[in-house]
Each structure stands twice: as structure tokens, then as C-alpha cells.
């Protein structure tokens, strides 16, 4: 099927989804969860093909981890779908309402956006996250995953479409672009007759390409250097636990720690403790010149190059730099592509407020790990993306962020004077 015909089918499906009840949506979501469980062996077999192809292509272990599905991860995906069922449906909810002097009852009511195009790399769970959230909000979706997860995504979409059809909904509500030709990405970005929003999920190059070539509004997000600043007053032992979690729990995640900024006054006592911990966790340290001498005990240490503090590591590598105070930490963050998730570890309330007000990130934390920037952690269910732009949506994009609104006026045969 051509992209044009896919767009037409998605638009027709979106019209139908916009009118169905929450109960119908939840019925279809339950069918998707059941079908994922029933066809788990086929899904895992498809994923095995992707992992084998990835190893043959020489992908890193961090990237292979992003691709991997196993029984536990698949069970987590199913649980996420069932979680979406329990969430409130924002469609139809009134944002606000007032009665004008002429008697017109005027309200803003949430509505689906329409057709969402999503271009993403790796992580096959994204396919289910997007489909389930779009379905709950009455949006159709057109998906283009990375070639690294081609077989996994194809099988997952087959499962979704079978469940939709069994629930009496159009299978075209979730469609997958299965042609690997990169030219189709450009064609999707210009399909503004049918597609209402583009969400790229991937690296800076993908976001730049979408922003420069799309005739459709683009949500920019997912990419950004995550920082943690250890202030002079921070509790060193508890800070190490937060740093370990932010860096090591899932280093391939976009909210994992990339750069650690340490106050100069505590560096001599704090960094040797950090080195021991990072050695245990086999983390490579990439240090600014002002930190090198204090990291001499590191098993894997190199001096930072010109672009290292602009690098989203997505693996067991950590940038380190010493700063004089919270203001210098914020200046470094502004210069080096902060915008996703950043944190300060401190017992100084004034510095905490200065950091929160000065950081331009979508999510800012005081004494907490950057790993919390996630739809599930925020209680939003799954997410379609983490937006790092100012307009429309910011941070994890859950159900509400996949809606727009319309004005609704109710009256008793009122005419305009």
C-alpha cells in the first residue's frame, strides 16, 4: 500500500475513533493485551531475528539492550497496556466553562488530534506504547520504526491490528510503514493532507531532519544531555546512590545521566569515593582537565574532547567536570544541550531554587535521579515521547498531551447581536 493510501485509511480510522466511547477503547486495549500474551512466542521469535541481525551488524551491547525483548520485558509491555485502560480518558472532558452575559454557555472540550506520525529508533516497546496511548485518545497512528527492530515491530503491529479487528475497530487505526526505503520518511513528513502531528523519537540527527523537512507540526524531544550537579552542601553518601541509579540502572535510556558536575570545594573528598563506585560498575570516566588529577584511580579514564560534553552516551560512560557554584553549573548546562532531565543534589534550599528556576530542562529534580522522567514513573501510563520543546507539550507526553480542544457553545436558539 502506498503512503498516500495509508494516510487516507488512517484519516478515515481517526474519524471513527473520535466518536467511539471510552468503554470501546478499553475493550480494544484489553484485546491487545490478551493478544500480546497469546502470541508471545511469535513476538519473541521475531525479536530474536532482530538481535541476531544486530549482532551480525556489530551493534554495541547498549544498542542490543535497547532492541531486546524477553519474557519479563514483554510482560511489562502487557502491564503497561492494562495500565492505560485504568487511566482516565481525557477526550470529551471540559477544560473550562463559563456562561456569557448573552446566555451562551462556552466551554473548551478535549478532542483527539487526529493522525499521529511517529518515527522512532530501536526499542520495540515504543510500538505498543504509541499505539495504546493513541487508541485511548482516539487518534490513529502511522509508525515508522528503525530497521534494527523491523521483525519485532512488524509482528507487534500484526498483533495490534488483529485485536482491533476483533474489537470491531478499523485495523488501519494503527499502521506500520514496512518499507525500509529512507525516502518514505521524507514522504511521510510531507503528508500534511492526512497527518496532523509528527513525533520523532531518536537522536539529534533525526530531530533535525524532521524539523527541517516536515510540512507537519513536529514535537521535538527525547534527545538531550542529562546532568547532575553535586552542590557543596550535598550529602556525599546519599548523592552517590542517586548518581549510581541515574547512570547505571539503565544506561541506554534517554534519561540516564550523561554529565556529572561537582562543586570544586568538595571534589577532593567526593571524587575518590565516586571513582571506587564507578570502577565497581565498570563505568568509563571522561573528564574535563580540572578533574583529571582527582580521578587518577579510575580504571577507565580519558580527558574530554571538544564534543564529549555534547554527547548523549547511552552507555556506561560518564562525563565529569568541576564547577565553582550553581551558576557555573547552569552556564555549562545551557552551553551543552541540556533540555531533557537535570538534577541538583543539595541541602541548600536557596541553591535548589536557583537551579530549578535557572535550568531550561523539561524535567528538573532536587535530590532525585534523572531516571524519573518517564510516563510510567509520573503516573501517566506509557508515553509517546519526552518533549523538550516549549510549545504544546513538555516532558513525558501521556494521554492529555495527545489531545487538542474545541470550543463548544450551547444556547437556546441564540443569535449574535
From Swiss-Prot:
It is found in: Cytoplasm. Pathway: Amino-acid biosynthesis; L-proline biosynthesis; L-glutamate 5-semialdehyde from L-glutamate: step 2/2. One of its GO terms (cellular component) is cytoplasm. HAMAP family: ProA. SUPFAM superfamilies: ALDH-like. It catalyses: L-glutamate 5-semialdehyde + phosphate + NADP(+) = L-glutamyl 5-phosphate + NADPH + H(+). InterPro entries: Ald_DH/histidinol_DH (IPR016161), Ald_DH_C (IPR016163), Ald_DH_N (IPR016162), Aldehyde_DH_dom (IPR015590), G-glutamylP_reductase_CS (IPR020593), Glu-5-SA_DH (IPR012134), GPR_dom (IPR000965). Catalyzes the NADPH-dependent reduction of L-glutamate 5-phosphate into L-glutamate 5-semialdehyde and phosphate. The product spontaneously undergoes cyclization to form 1-pyrroline-5-carboxylate. NCBIfam families: PRK00197.1, proA. This is Gamma-glutamyl phosphate reductase. GO terms for molecular function: glutamate-5-semialdehyde dehydrogenase activity; NADP binding. It is an enzyme of class 1 (oxidoreductase). The keyword Amino-acid biosynthesis applies. Its EC number is 1.2.1.41. It comes from the Bacteria. One of its GO terms (biological process) is L-proline biosynthetic process. It holds the Pfam family Aldedh. The keyword ATP-binding does not apply. Keywords: Amino-acid biosynthesis, Cytoplasm, NADP, Oxidoreductase, Proline biosynthesis. Belongs to the gamma-glutamyl phosphate reductase family.
